[in-house]
Amino acid sequence: MQKIRKGDKVVVLTGKDKGRTGEVIQVMPKEDRALVRGVNVVKRHQRQTQNQEAGIITKEASIHLSNIAIADPKDGKPTRVGFKIDGDKKVRVAKRSGDVIDG
């Protein structure tokens, strides 16, 4: 079970976007990286194609999983993730507040 999943609210811990929050768009577990909306935005020169014109576009670049942390559901500060058995389901729990992260 992954600690960070698509749709999670995360906080950037290091780098040029330190302290910014965003939603995880995609997780790449083999590369240990994730795409976060509005974080690590880069400009790319796009070549013209049949359905897209040329120009400079901005898009999110991936960020290493060690540089982001889940935002605590209670106060929005970064927290570590633990696991707990709730009935017959395994759920993610914020170590900071003890709140369940999963729905």
Swiss-Prot record:
Keywords recorded for this protein, A-Z: Ribonucleoprotein, Ribosomal protein, RNA-binding, rRNA-binding
InterPro entries assigned: KOW, Rib_uL2_dom2, Ribosomal_uL24, Ribosomal_uL24_CS, Ribosomal_uL24_KOW, Translation_prot_SH3-like_sf
PROSITE patterns listed in its UniProt record: RIBOSOMAL_L24
Pfam families cross-referenced by the UniProt entry: KOW, ribosomal_L24
Signal peptide: none
One function term, GO molecular function aspect: rRNA binding
GO cellular component, one term: ribonucleoprotein complex
One example of a Gene Ontology biological process annotation: translation
Cystine bridges: none
CDD domains: KOW_RPL26
Function statement: One of two assembly initiator proteins, it binds directly to the 5'-end of the 23S rRNA, where it nucleates assembly of the 50S subunit.
Record family assignment: Belongs to the universal ribosomal protein uL24 family.
Subunit structure: Part of the 50S ribosomal subunit.
Name listed for the protein in its UniProt record: Large ribosomal subunit protein uL24
Species this protein is from: Rhizobium meliloti (strain 1021) (Ensifer meliloti)
